[in-house]
Amino acid sequence: MKIYNTLTKAKEEFIPLQEGKVSMYVCGPTVYNYIHIGNARPVVVFDTVRRYLEYKGYDVNFVSNFTDVDDKIIKKANEEGVSAHEISERYIKEYLKDTEALNVLPVTTRPKATEEIDGMIDMIEELIEKGHAYEKNGTVYFKTRSFKQYGKLSKKNIDDLEAGARIAVADEKDDPMDFVLWKPKKVGEPAWSAPWCDGRPGWHIECSVMSKKYLGDQIDIHAGGEDLIFPHHENEIAQTECCTGKEFAKYWMHNGFLNVDNKKMSKSEGNFFTVREIFAEYAPAVLRFFLLSVNYRSPINFSRDIIESSKNGLERIQTAVEQLHFLAKVKAEKGELSTELTESESTLLKEFDALIKKFEDAMDDDFNTADAISSIFEMVKLSNTYVTVESSVEMIQKVLSNITTFCDILGLETEKKAEILDEEIEQLIADRQSARKAKDFAKSDEIRNLLLEKGIILEDTREGVKWKRA
């Protein structure tokens, strides 16, 4: 199996640090709003990477954090007149709902930055002691030039970067390229006590500390969107390697950007979509299918035509699986339970074996989900053409198992959501309202998630609860 390593700009044979085990860290969201479809891409991509590694027999320790203290969170809190904690907790819950709807598996550990402050202070103190950081008026800066390999991930030259940084350099910095590890508190901001001043950590130190605590000094895979290569991941490497003296991550993986109608997604362009807005029109499984339809390192373009194509593609697979379940049921009802394969069926299964290898070859080649999906479509075509009510039970079950197994590796749902009657929806909404009045918010969330699983989107408005089918 080969992985494209951003560090070396080449596909490399995947050899984990410890045989049979994989340590994996993916930078998580800054929780101040609902996630948009661009945010969803790394979540789905690296969930799929994790799924395939587990299929290959690896024990995966997958850590992904929540950045729950940040300028954007504080700004949102001030606008709403609530605490930063209230904002972050609200959107952590919404994030988990959205990712669950996208069929993303729970990660092994989900640390929050605000719960790891002591570890951040400890690492900053260690960097100061080792001569890699310094304090000025309460602010602690990382001494970038103390790390001789700075720029090795992004391939940026520190002298070229310095020329651009001089324009906005703070007077107290020793060097324009030095970055903040700890910043003093401001009025109305959350703060923690530290040896230098009451304040809060810089963004980059958070991930260095959390990955080190939960995965150790060295990890196999560090991943995220390509926008994180510089400065975030570059700075993580500098901090961590200056502390440990060891190579931080063996493989660096980065997904490409998502555009909308071939333009950068932005609110000013009017082409900005949260995943909730997509869920209002399409099942979450359709969005997941779309996000995996292109090689993860390539840019991906979202448009109405393309998402419709993804919907149709997923339905082709689901219809084939539905037909296979139907055939198996017919056989069972007739009592035809023979497991013997005919000669022609044995020959046909060899074609399926070739497609299984094709799927695995695609995924072994840097997780090429686009080609892997193509292999599933070829399985579906063979099934639709040759598997009939005359086929043996063994044949039907093997074909069904092949298709569902490989869809599951990609996290693609093979069963269509059962239709729910309007009356059932209204009753569940009424039950949810009763739970909310009784302040049973756990029950309220449970009902909302149940409806979401059935493709029903709720919207709480001043006029009451409105709902629509995805």
Curated annotation (Swiss-Prot):
GO CC annotation, single: cytosol
Compartment(s) of residence: Cytoplasm
Cofactor: Zn(2+)
Chain residues that bind ATP: 267
Listed EC numbers: 6.1.1.16
Catalysed transformations (reactions): tRNA(Cys) + L-cysteine + ATP = L-cysteinyl-tRNA(Cys) + AMP + diphosphate
Short sequence motif 'KMSKS' region: positions: 264-268
Gene3D superfamilies: Cysteine-tRNA ligase, C-terminal anti-codon recognition domain, HUPs
Secretion signal span: none
Ligand binding (Zn(2+)): 27, 207, 232, 236
Source taxon at top rank: Bacteria
GO annotation, biological process: cysteinyl-tRNA aminoacylation
Motif ('HIGH' region): 29-39
Top-level class of the enzyme under EC nomenclature: ligase
Keywords: Aminoacyl-tRNA synthetase, ATP-binding, Cytoplasm, Ligase, Metal-binding, Nucleotide-binding, Protein biosynthesis, Zinc
Pfam families, alphabetized: CysS_C, DALR_2, tRNA-synt_1e
GO terms of molecular function: ATP binding; cysteine-tRNA ligase activity; zinc ion binding
InterPro entries associated with the record: Cys-tRNA-ligase, Cys-tRNA-synt_Ia_DALR, Cys-tRNA/MSH_ligase, CysS_C, Rossmann-like_a/b/a_fold, tRNA-synt_1_cat_dom, tRNAsynth_Ia_anticodon-bd
Protein's UniProt keywords contain Translocase: no
Cofactor notes: Binds 1 zinc ion per subunit.
Classification via NCBIfam families: cysS
Subunit structure: Monomer.
HAMAP family: Cys_tRNA_synth (MF_00041)
Family statement drawn from the similarity comment of this UniProt entry: Belongs to the class-I aminoacyl-tRNA synthetase family.
Protein name, per record: Cysteine--tRNA ligase
Species assigned in the record: Lachnoclostridium phytofermentans (strain ATCC 700394 / DSM 18823 / ISDg) (Clostridium phytofermentans)
